[in-house]
Amino acid sequence: MIASPDRTPLPREFFDRPVLEVAPDLLGRILVRTGPDGPITLRLTEVEAYDGQNDPGSHAYRGRTPRNEVMFGPPGHVYVYFTYGMWFCMNLVCGPEGRSSAVLLRAGEIIDGAELARTRRLSARNDKELAKGPARLATALGVDRALNGTDACTSQETPLRILTGTPVPGDQVRNGPRTGVAGEGGVHPWRYWVADDPTVSPYRAHVPRKRRS
């Protein structure tokens, strides 16, 4: 059987480009998460670009560590990190190996497997909120550290794959500052989203944490 065009895995060459090219081009692409409970399919509607050691907002800004090792590897692999002691977030590595650039997957529309996603996101008021925000997206898809380093652009059956989908036309793509990024990194307009899409998360500027007295 010939695969339909929108379900063809994205080639590694897609990710082997500058992060500011890859990030907006990921909008409309399809993410398939396959786990023991069943598959969930999601259409990406919001992402953020992080340009490695050149970017103060990036985990790789201060160099290679055990935590960010995957960011320095081949493009097209999954980088998962744990944040605030509670949530996982998922990125796709891009650019040439060693560049350490990645795209944070911020939001998407669940197009298949919503029933399973609802069991993981009990606080969601409706299906548009199931993957509205990076931690919610990861929770809905059942993402954890076990996915860190997964090759997402392969034709093989893996726990997570990124497929061609339907790219969003340029006139429907918006961009602005990244959510919650402080300092110099906060001025870059490297957050990209689908205009007027109800699954896109609201922008929030960085708010310094108050120290306990």
Curated annotation (Swiss-Prot):
Family the entry assigns: Belongs to the DNA glycosylase MPG family.
Protein name: Putative 3-methyladenine DNA glycosylase
Keyword field: DNA damage, DNA repair, Hydrolase
NCBIfam families reported for this sequence: 3mg, PRK00802.1-3
Source species taxonomy: Bacteria, Bacillati, Actinomycetota, Actinomycetes, Kitasatosporales
EC number annotated for this UniProt entry: 3.2.2.-
GO molecular function: alkylbase DNA N-glycosylase activity; DNA binding
Organism listed in the record: Streptomyces coelicolor (strain ATCC BAA-471 / A3(2) / M145)
Record has Ribonucleoprotein as a keyword: no
GO terms of biological process kind: base-excision repair
Superkingdom of the source species: Bacteria
Enzyme class: hydrolase
InterPro entries listed in its UniProt record: Formyl_transferase-like_C_sf (IPR011034), MPG (IPR003180), MPG_sf (IPR036995)
